[in-house]
Amino acid sequence: MLIPSSSSIPSSLSASASDSEPSSLNGSGISDQNILPNYHLHHHLINENEMEAANYAQVIKPTCEAFQDWPHTPMLYQQPQLHFMLPQHDWAYPHLAQSLPPPHHLTPSTAAVAAATIASQSSIINQTSVVTSTPSCQIKQEVERPEIIQRLMPPWPPAYQFSCDDSGSVSGAGGPHQPLSDISDDSEQTCPDDLEGFAKQFKQRRIKLGYTQADVGVALGTLYGNIFSQTTICRFEALQLSFKNMCKLKPLLFKWLEEADSTTGSPNSTFEKMTGQAGRKRKKRTSIEVNVKSRLEFHFQSNQKPNAQEITQVAMELQLEKEVVRVWFCNRRQKEKRIAPNQYDAPHPMALNNGYPMTADLFPYQAVVNHYTQQSPRQQ
């Protein structure tokens, strides 16, 4: 082993060694001052080697760890699989509930996270129930298990998904009620049978009172400010409107029917003047008996166009109104034209183009016929 000279030893090491260790002689006579510097130099070299190894480890180790932590190359065309699951209660997954740790083993942070998760799940469940609720179905929660939701089929078809209250207002399933008018009737308990019965009763009463469907629409417009067409009234009587519109229109027609019934017998009543229907009632259809009709037919064959005096005599004979007899003759002539359309347009056979009649002397038709009849046997 080579011992470096004293000139190569740092002065600090030699000074520290001389200060810290006392000078003594060993058994060979060599002083300790010559041995201690070599000892410190050896330890100094060892420390330098350890520092270099540590630096090498610090450089190599992060590189290896970084290589190990480097993300693997993703596979091509690998589609992520997303699974959407609605949040359920613990009773829906008992095997998962058993695997969860008991509550007393949870730390405060874990308990807070679990509480937040439960709150978010409950809010999502509420939002899901609100979104999935539609007007065409009803939601029912059982008393024993409020977390169970049952869907019931609607009693009406999808077109009939509305309900009415006492004021005739219409609202959707679960929506706020909006009053249509101040009229009140028993439309809260309205059902298809009630609407059908009311429509049939309304049609019978309207015809008996002599009002047309157009008259009813105009009257409703004058009373309530919304004129309904004749088609709407016709569709109501035929039950061709939706349940919502039937409920809207029923209280209006119910009120109009009460007013019309209360003013029966007074042709110029206040109700008719207010609705503008005075003098516009439909006249009842006249029914003529069979024997009276046969007498009228006899008079028609004798004279198709009677004058006013003859019409009056026929009316007195048959005990009919003069207007009824006049209208009957007019209708009978129209019927005759439909049966024989060319009868009234073709000229009379005994008339010329100038309108003067032809007599037998001017047109000896029979003599010509006899002449040709007599000549035919001679030719044979």
From Swiss-Prot:
The keyword DNA-binding applies. Gene3D superfamilies: Homeodomain-like (1.10.10.60), lambda repressor-like DNA-binding domains (1.10.260.40). GO terms for cellular component: cytoplasm; cytosol; nucleus. Residues 187-261 form the POU-specific domain. It is found in: Nucleus. SUPFAM superfamilies: Homeodomain-like, lambda repressor-like DNA-binding domains. Keywords: Developmental protein, Differentiation, DNA-binding, Homeobox, Nucleus. Interacts with egl-27, sox-2 and sem-4. Interacts with wdr-5.1. Belongs to the POU transcription factor family. Class-3 subfamily. This is Homeobox protein ceh-6. It comes from Caenorhabditis elegans. The gene is ceh-6.
